[in-house]
Amino acid sequence: MARIKRGTNNRKRHKKVLKQAKGYYGSKHTLFKTANQAVMKSLAYSYVGRKRRKRDFRKLWIARINAATRMHDLSYSKFMHGLKVAGVDLNRKVLADMAVRDEKEFAKLVELAKNNL
């Protein structure tokens, strides 16, 4: 059986990792070992970040809705319950956007929620 050397495979793998590490600080973008560690860590961070983004945006939307409803003397939980009883099926993303961009329509929703409590 012929001897197989890994020169081309290693070069290809190293180039792939170093390409991913482009723009990293110091030796992390030039030395393979440190670049490989940095790339692995960054991939782990990006995976976690994609999960966290969903939580963070939901928290942001709730905070915005809460702030807007409290200006109309209503808490977030009572507002959401009032909307549910009224049969309004708008998600938090849309409600937060309305609270920021369209205050008059949001005020109507708050009144609707108050009337259905």
From Swiss-Prot:
GO terms for cellular component: ribonucleoprotein complex; ribosome. It comes from the Bacteria. GO terms for molecular function: rRNA binding; structural constituent of ribosome. Keywords: Ribonucleoprotein, Ribosomal protein, RNA-binding, rRNA-binding. One of its GO terms (biological process) is translation. InterPro entries: Ribosomal_bL20, RIBOSOMAL_L20_CS, Ribosomal_protein_bL20_C. Binds directly to 23S ribosomal RNA and is necessary for the in vitro assembly process of the 50S ribosomal subunit. It is not involved in the protein synthesizing functions of that subunit. Belongs to the bacterial ribosomal protein bL20 family. This is Large ribosomal subunit protein bL20. The lineage of its organism: Bacteria, Bacillati, Bacillota, Tissierellia, Tissierellales.
